[in-house]
Amino acid sequence: TLDRSSAASDVYKRQVQGWFCIELCSKEVTVMNKEYLIYKLSDEVKNSCKIDKDAFTKFNVKRGLRNEDGSGVLVGLTNIGNVVGYERDENGKLKPTEGKLYYRGYELDDLVTPLLKEKRFGFEEVAFLLLSGQLPDKEELEAFKELLNDNMPLDHRTITHIIELEGSNIMNILARCVLEMYTFDPNPDDISRDNLMRQSVELIAKFPTIIAYAYNIYRHSVQGRSLHIRHPRENLSIAENFLYMMKHENYSELDARMLDLLLIIQAEHGGGNNSTFTVRVTSSTRTDTYSSIAAGIGSLKGPLHGGANIKVINMFHHLKEAIKDWTNVNELDIYLKRMLNKEAYDKTGLIYGIGHAVYTLSDPRAVELKRLAGELAKEKGREDEYNFLKLIEQEGIKCLQEHRGGSKPACANLDFYSGFIYEMIGLPQEIYTPIFAMARIVGWTAHRIEELNFEGRRIIRPAYKNILGELDYTPLGER
């Protein structure tokens, strides 16, 4: 067994070289096997990829496309979403403020509150708004719902493809199915507005079905459970149809309405979030819709973007075991400080679900989800857990600010309550991030349409400065 740790890399190198070294005419000839060659290439990267942190300051590099004060570098304009987390004072400095999120000029709370009061589903209405820029009237909304429902069933070839994949990662299956849709599209490369809108509606409609089928097949092939493939039903909302395809009729009306609201809250978040920006960057090249959306899925799959809610719910389960008294603030504070000092839990120094790149005093999505989580916890008999989660939020923010020296405010983000809601609805962790994609496909397609239709558009092409310098070439025989 070879030790491949970085600390023992020299030992590993000698082991491999020794095993594959032969004596020939008093001359050692090293035969590099493929495994060692991969190691050697990887080892060289340690130096070739090293860039001094001071160089970023020297050349005024906007790392992560962020300014020195933490605000995002302005790279584009949009009419779709607006993320507000701070204001600027008279000197241009950032001033923390309560967070707000706008969809096509409408504040998120103004869209969500009527749905709660009227106890109706609204994801389709919000999708219409984000795609078109206008709120639908009753007739338009009913026609749009029918259009989405008509497009939910999958081509039999796509179903066969999902069955053949039997993958353990639903996001990868989703991306591959999206790319496969290119093959079945009669006009896949057409970027006219009509065709873009048709493709967008079809993607929004098919994402729930792909995800539900992919999970059920994963559940069968990997977990050995019974295989159930349920076709979407007419006259059900997207949220209801998704739960039906996942769980048959084993869900409540409140479960479906909570999922519907979760989809609304995650549908859009401006043009600068990583996955939406990825879609806009790829769209600026005029590539096809399916390639662009698959790239967005790849971005969202990353644990720093779409996978954080799983980290929050796992941390929550750990804290439920680690803290004996869920009402003891002092006991919780001590443990959270140990986490920040990398002494407890996964020793990353993080309290998952606390902090955001833009929001300062509050994340409006987390505010809405906190309200929804409380309503659902009451129905499910999980109010003690909900109250403990609220206490973790309260003390986590306080401990993080103390740890930072009080210089920067922090708040709970979208991921803090979303995983708990998914769990109460009875949805497995394997589809937490895919559900995020099921919601965000609306924002992605809206931004793609906008990127390809505003005046003066250009391919997005930022600059990278090379700091290596020139080298003299050495002939192969002299190396």
Residue ranges and their predicted role:
Residues T1-Q15:
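Single conserved hydrophobic/aromatic residue that forms the stacking wall/gate
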